[in-house]
Amino acid sequence: MCKSLRYCFSHCLYLAMTRLEEVNREVNMHSSVRYLGYLARFNLLVAICLGLYVRWEKTANSLILVIFILGLFVLGIASILYYYFSMEAASLSLSNLWFGFLLGLLCFLDNSSFKSDVKEETTKYLLLTSIVLRILCALVERLSGYVRHRPTLLTTVEFLELVGFAIASTTMLVERSLSVILLVMALAMLIIDLRMKSFLAIPNLIIFSVLLFFSSLETPQNPIAFACFFICLITDPFLDIYFSGLSVTERWKPFLYRGRICRRLSVVFTGMIELTFFTLSAFKLRDTHLWYFVIPGFSIFGIFWMICHIIFLLTLWGFHTKLNDCHKVYINHRADNNSLDRIMASKGMRHFCLISEQLVFFSLLATAILGAVSWQPTNGIFLSMFLIVLPLESMAHGLFHELGNCLGGTSVGYAIVIPTNFCSPDGQPTLLPPEHVQELNLRSTGMLNAIQRFFAYHMIETYGCDYSTSGLSFDTLHSKLKAFLELRTVDGPRHDTYVLYYSGHTHGSGEWALAGGDILRLDTLLEWWREKNGSFCSRLIIILDSENSTPWVKEVRKINDQYVAVQGAELAKTVDIEEADPPQLGDFTRDWVEYNCNSTNNICWTEKGRTVKAMYGVSKRWSDYTLHLPTGSDVAKHWMLHFPRITYPLVHLANWLCGLNLFWMCKACFRCLKRLKMSWFLPTVLDTGQGFKLVKS
């Protein structure tokens, strides 16, 4: 008896200690990453303090000493608010504002007379170290999965540091200060552009970086400090271009879900910025040195710019009008769990966005041409406004481009559930013992309900949900799948996406086990798909909740000629029954449907110790997939419906330029990069563009 009690006690103690060690390892890793961020912040604080001390020591300016002491006092107050009053938001806001302000002072105070001073050199190395630590911390956080991406345009930290930096620029002359304030606004626009993953965000980043150190931009006296400020702010949105798994509508949620008046005012604000840029461009007419080139060029391209931007503003206004109609439907049908993106698709927003993308491209082209004709390398305000307008128009282009690519795709789904848990020695399904029938029926019914919920939530047309306890014969499955794969929309074209769900017995190599000893291979299914799909560009997404889905996930990656994806699951072979229940078929379906149908879910696919792990694979051409594009007649009808008659001649120019495919080389490179990403760096979460996502653990 004593031995049994001692054994039980020692066993329980061992389990508790093992679990404690695992938790400690996870906590220690998270703490290490957090401390790395603290180290980068502390290193930056030391660099700022040392730099300001050097400037006070060499210039004997008492104002620097007052600001320095006041800064330390404010940071002390922030620490007291954080640790003693638990006012974390107020404390962090105060400290971030002062970090930006003090770093701005370090940038703008003249250091030309003591650049070779040892303390000044130490400050530079500390700033460079801060840059490295900041990049390393952000990268490790994302590789470890500790960052939870949320929809936002600018974070509070970014906004306050930008404001603090802009306030510090007021220590200079008015014209130089205005140039820097506009440059800070341009940096904010660039951060938003990167976070929204706009199509032209990376070129904008390159242009901004190249122009950043022009003397006409009033680049601060300390370029290392300014580079530290710029890189520390740009690191997170730049890395999130790859690491963020948010869908298009999730990324743009702060804008799309904004109030009607705010969105209308944003169009007015955009018009004011564009008009200011045009006015500053007109200052080039004062240059009499090249009047024979400037005056005709500005007259021609200025008129072209005006017409394009009238169309640009009317396009934005029309977009918000259609978005307001979608919001009315969304508010009236919120109880039905209809998301805004599905309502936008039903309202024809995709067609509008695809045409608007071409029109906004003209605005970008006109801005680039006018900027080149009116180039003023000695006017920092002009260059700063140019850097504001570019990402602003790039965001509009990116919004229309991404909404046009992700909205409006029609889809149809078919589910097959064969609840077979026990197999004969030759691998064929057999009838279950009576005591297991009720449990299996409940689990199978749960799978059917889950997949029907999935189809209904994402507005996927349901072809059928077949449930068979005795299995399906090859001929029966053949006829059903062929009928499913040849389905078309009411208007006649094929559906954009076909979703096939299967849960049942499979062989070790992934084939579906059918009644009568037959099997269904992936090659056979793809042969049927090619026969029905023909020259169309539809997609096939196969969802497997079976014990052997890995072979199909690997095999689909070798397909070259079709757009096919396989979402599978891997059940843990050995599980400690004292910590978790053994995984069963249906567990993956439950979690995956909950993940895709509940935006507030707490499911983490990369969590350690999961008994059901997700995996997916896509064909080589998956990233090349695009929906049907509008024709020239579609563009002409849209133009006559939304724009004044005076702009009609641009219809032919629009169709001609779009037919040229000016970005064919960029698109080819972009396509190669996307293929490389999907083959070598497969994302943890892949947005299908239909509202649901494929995931891997």
UniProtKB/Swiss-Prot annotation:
The chain crosses the membrane at residues 36-56, 63-83, 89-109, 172-192, 199-219, 223-243, 265-285, 293-313, 352-372, 380-400, 646-666. GO terms for biological process: regulation of ubiquitin-dependent protein catabolic process. This is Transmembrane protein 168. It comes from Rattus norvegicus (Rat). It comes from the Eukaryota. It is found in: Nucleus membrane. The keyword Glycoprotein applies. Glycans are attached at N111, N337, N533, N598. Keywords: Glycoprotein, Membrane, Nucleus, Transmembrane, Transmembrane helix. It is a multi-pass membrane protein. GO terms for molecular function: sodium channel regulator activity. Belongs to the TMEM168 family. Plays a key role in maintaining the cardiac electrical stability by modulating cell surface expression of SCN5A. May play a role i the modulation of anxiety behavior by regulating GABAergic neuronal system in the nucleus accumbens. GO terms for cellular component: nuclear membrane.
